[in-house]
């Protein structure tokens, strides 16, 4: 089922919201009462423009329970500010219940910070040397190991348009073309 509503007229959003609610209710009912708790055929929702359509009121709870019933969602948003606007205090529940997160780039600060924090830190070797001139000249060499963010928020902001960063639960992040 593919639904298209005009992005310039929000008056049709309620129809999509009702459709989602009915589909989720029916799929859950079928899984729970007719299929032993799991649908025999996996169902995937591709929710493009996720932040711009009406969603079931309990979407966060649906997202956290759908996997056990052979249902999944692909959620497509522009940035995390959209999630924060929709879900206020519970927005972190959405990415927290997603096993895969693909960052394609963006221009919103809190998203840059979030991605930078997800990437974590790495270690770098730092070599420094110094020399003093004079009667009793001396020199020194120091080697240090320092922790550094893999990408600072600013480096995340400048991510090449041909690259993406992929986070898969249980694996190290991947940078891909």
Q: Where would I find each of the regions flagged by the language model?
A:
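Conserved P-loop NTPase motor cores
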Residues: 3-141, 172
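Conserved P-loop NTPase motor module
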Residues: 130, 136-177
